[in-house]
Amino acid sequence: MHLAVVGLSHRTAPVEVRERLSIPEHHLETSLQSLRSHEQVLETSILSTCNRLEIYSLLRHPEDGVEAIRDFLANHSGLADPDLQPHLFALHHEEAIQHLLRVSAGLDSLVLGEGQILSQVKKMYRLGQDHKSIGPILNRLLNQAVSTGKRVRSETNLGSGAVSISSAAVELAQLKVGQEQGVDDLVSLSQEKVAVVGAGRMARLLLQHLQSKGARSITVVNRTVAKAEVLAKDFPDLVITCCGLDQLDAQLASNTLLFTSTGADEPIIDRQRLDAITRQARLMLVDIGVPRNISSDAADVSGTLSYDVDDLQEVVERNVAARQQLAQQAEVLLDEDRQAFLDWWDGLEAVPTINRMRQQFEEIRKQELLKALSRMGSDFSQREKQVVEALTKGLINKILHGPTTALRAPQPRQQRLDSMAAAQRLFDLPGDDADRDRSDAK
């Protein structure tokens, strides 16, 4: 068995590549089933966000398993090898474990310490359980990742403050508006006519940050107007107007700052649409959707400034230095949790020996109990038989508790192997070829 992660992120691929590999939630079940159907993939889970697509898997064989996942990504994206493979990374065993813990803690995010990624890791975990694509190994690892993400945020200040893709998008708008005014700093958005396209989680975060940065009147554009109206009720201090996507052209014409965050598979704003609209003022577009909601040719339209998630790096670099020390504190916690998982993983090597030991003792218990009860004849009531059976089971558990704990305990691998061999000799346990297979896979 071999643990690996294969994927890409904002660190390895531009948004035009990432959007080709993005997997919508309603397609995740099919994708998980497709991966699990491959003979090399024993367990698998998918993390798909605006900044990364990563597949965590337990594989029969490292090279063949990784190749199977690369083939899946190529087929899913429709990209030719020269356009895809340079952007993919593959990490194995300890590096894969460390990477997932860093991702869950927000240490690998574009916005260092952002909190939304932990929710996305939780969703990956839940979907893996719901669709039965994960087994005991990934179940334990994903559980550890969620715990680590929570621990980092509770034991350090890395997650404090407004750190998310949405907050960075609002800060980018502040920065660009300030630069228009000759100010190299974040300015209030109180003079901007603002619209937000979308009414999901990201749109909610956008409204929160826009409100804190001075915006007071905002239009929410959404395919379902009722959903936009529900969102608007949560912001009583904002003047929010809601409308459908059929009013998008009017909003492009009347607003000066427009954010997009929808789940659309194709751009909803492009040059052709913008060229057909008459505007009297500059229009700034900030797209945090992946796949992108705004076509790259929108920036070619006169009087239009267009930014996507890759442009958020400018804001990130302004804030990263102040958070690096907090990140170093978090790395210490990650090392502890990584070692805890590795200790558990290494302890699995002793499981076959422990199981055979328990099976052998259970057979002896049953045989001796049967002899004793047969000698007692009908003198024992059913209740008394149950008490004696519980007694013998309790004795076996007590006797085996020490050896079981010793075999599972964190220790050098050779020491564990010596202990397993000693248990086999002492209790005359049968051998198991699977033990050697597991040892070879380590």
Swiss-Prot record:
One of its GO terms (molecular function) is glutamyl-tRNA reductase activity. PROSITE patterns: GLUTR (PS00747). It comes from the Bacteria. Residues 420-442 are annotated as: Disordered. NADP(+) binds at G198, A199, G200, R201, M202, A203. Keywords: Chlorophyll biosynthesis, NADP, Oxidoreductase, Porphyrin biosynthesis. Pathway: Porphyrin-containing compound metabolism; protoporphyrin-IX biosynthesis; 5-aminolevulinate from L-glutamyl-tRNA(Glu): step 1/2; Porphyrin-containing compound metabolism; chlorophyll biosynthesis. During catalysis, the active site Cys acts as a nucleophile attacking the alpha-carbonyl group of tRNA-bound glutamate with the formation of a thioester intermediate between enzyme and glutamate, and the concomitant release of tRNA(Glu). The thioester intermediate is finally reduced by direct hydride transfer from NADPH, to form the product GSA. HAMAP family: Glu_tRNA_reductase. Belongs to the glutamyl-tRNA reductase family. Possesses an unusual extended V-shaped dimeric structure with each monomer consisting of three distinct domains arranged along a curved 'spinal' alpha-helix. The N-terminal catalytic domain specifically recognizes the glutamate moiety of the substrate. The second domain is the NADPH-binding domain, and the third C-terminal domain is responsible for dimerization. Homodimer. This is Glutamyl-tRNA reductase. It comes from Synechococcus sp. (strain RCC307).
